[in-house]
């Protein structure tokens, strides 16, 4: 039904499109529309239940893929950035912290330079006004070899694998292999993984790096 379609879309938006930022600006033309033509031939979904959950799961997967592609297609972008925050006190805090991180111009510039600057991540978390304990927070950068900005599915990476570098542990900066960090962060898709110990909630957000081309593109035309 129209009511359940609207409910599903609003639920999906919270963990997909609302977790995307290219440059922090929202166009007045940004629009999201969902329509159903009835051609699937299934029984109309009029309430929550197994069929609704199946539809919602499929919708979330589709919207997640599209949200990542929006971030990957940012003006002048060379790198897709996914930020995962785990161990937050609630889902809202986890998502908000992740989005604060990927929205930071300094973090975005560091991602362009493949610079493992965890201080900028902590700075963004700090000025967010959100509740977290930096003394029990840890940070990794991870990636997959030969990763691309454009893909159909993007799972969180194992944080202790070949393409992972931990830079901050329980409030203490770590000595780390700078060459490895550069390699990890030079891939086209990079994950910032933040582990808190404030609860059991997780959230994520997607963004991109801030490049010279972004400034050129937006400095060369009038909107």
Language model regions located:
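A structural signal for small-residue-enriched, beta-sheet-centric alpha/beta enzyme cores
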Residues: 1-223
């Amino acid at each position: 039904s129209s009511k359940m379609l609207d409910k599903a879309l609003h639920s999906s938006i919270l963990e997909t499109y609302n977790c995307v930022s290219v440059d922090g600006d929202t166009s007045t033309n940004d629009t999201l529309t969902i329509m159903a033509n009835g051609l699937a031939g299934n029984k109309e979904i009029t309430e929550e239940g197994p069929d609704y959950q199946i539809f919602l799961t499929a919708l979330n997967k589709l919207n997640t893929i599209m949200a990542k592609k929006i971030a990957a297609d940012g003006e002048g972008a060379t790198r897709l950035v996914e930020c995962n925050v785990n161990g937050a006190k609630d889902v809202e805090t986890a998502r908000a912290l992740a989005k604060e991180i990927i929205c930071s111009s300094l973090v975005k510039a560091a991602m362009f330079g493949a610079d493992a600057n965890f201080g900028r991540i902590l700075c963004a978390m700090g000025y967010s006004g959100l509740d977290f304990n930096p003394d029990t927070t840890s940070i990794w950068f991870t990636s997959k070899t030969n990763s691309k900005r454009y893909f159909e599915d993007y799972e969180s990476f194992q944080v202790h694998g070949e393409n992972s570098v931990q830079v901050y542990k329980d409030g203490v900066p770590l000595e780390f292999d700078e060459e490895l960090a550069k390699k990890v962060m030079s891939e086209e898709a990079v994950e910032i993984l933040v582990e808190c110990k404030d609860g059991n909630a997780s959230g994520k957000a997607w963004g991109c790096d801030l490049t010279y081309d972004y400034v050129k593109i937006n400095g060369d035309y009038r909107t």
